[in-house]
Amino acid sequence: LVFFSVIGLTGSSLMVRLPLVRDILNISTGTLGLILVAGSAGAMGGLLYVGKFVARVGTKRSGIVGMSIWFFGWVLVSIGLAIGSPIVFAIGNFFGGIGAGVTDVSINVDGSAIEQRLGRAAMPKMHAAFSIGTLLGAGLGTLAIQINLNLAVQIGILTTISYLIPVFISRYLPSDNGLHSEEEKAGTAGPVFTKVVVLLGLGIFGMTLAEGASNDWLAIGLVDDYNADPTSAGIGFAILVASMTIVRFFGGSLTDRLGKALTLRITGVLGVLGLVLLIARINIPLAWAGSFLWGVGVALAFPLFLSAAGEQPNPARKVATVSAFGYASFLVGPPLLGFVGQAIGVVN
């Protein structure tokens, strides 16, 4: 839970200040989209190998390695903001993405193992911890706007805190989670790209496109297309993260009652309604309501798809493969929406 909560803290504190990032780096919206994609590219690169790595060393060691790479990347992000360098910022985002990808697979394999031991859905609550961390980060980012805190200092402080806490608590984690099963050692665990894994991957691709759009562009969309002030945009992002947190916290019980598929269908319809409210561009309060429903729509996709992947044989590699589909979506989404948004407006 600690790993889940800290991995999104720093990034969400940055997302609510993306308009300022654009100004500090002196770049266009389209260029910002390309720079943001560096993180997803790094995550994709890490996911190509992380399944085998986790199976070899276990989730405890791979999680610490991932967080260490993540820390290095976000230190570079802070430096890039301090000196106004888009290149350093992008390189840091790339390494931060690699570290996040390695850590993400490690903690989701752990989460799936816990679910199987409990015999009930637990992954949504773990992803709720991630949402709590991102909500806290969004709140801290909004507070930083109010007190005019230097953005590089903000990122540096939160990066350090987010790294030291999981490193300290890692000593209490089991060291054998995620290691090769007897079937894998004997080479009888079967192929990674099964029909189920591909279908799960396609599903998570679509849903993470919607989630990535909300994380990367909601604040800028409210500023540019609603003429909202930075604080109102930050509130909109915080509402989105809050709704995701609430749904993930209670999503386990809902999933146990309705099943994964029906739960995703219901929340998905609500998410579409939220997007319609945002696209209508009526006023800021309705945009906030749309942000809330958007969060409801995307909240359970990642935990439930990865939970299903973790139920398959060879879980570390299956989770890594399905995660790769999700990060591919994050890879495609930011630049695509950035260039289209520059031409016709982010909300459009």
Q: What role is predicted for each listed range?
A:
Residues 5, 73, 85-103, 287-299:
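Hydrophobic core of transmembrane alpha-helices in multi-pass small-molecule transporters
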Residues 16-30, 216-232:
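Short amphipathic helix-loop junctions that connect adjacent transmembrane helices
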Residues 21-22, 53-54, 143-148, 222-223, ...:
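Interfacial helix-cap and linker-helix signal at transmembrane-aqueous boundaries
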Residues 46-59, 145, 247-260, 341-342:
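Helix-to-loop junctions at the C-terminal end of transmembrane segments
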Residues 60-63, 264:
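Primarily marks hydrophobic transmembrane alpha-helices of the MFS/SLC 12-helix fold
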Residues 101-116, 299-313:
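Intracellular juxtamembrane helix-capping segments at the cytosolic ends
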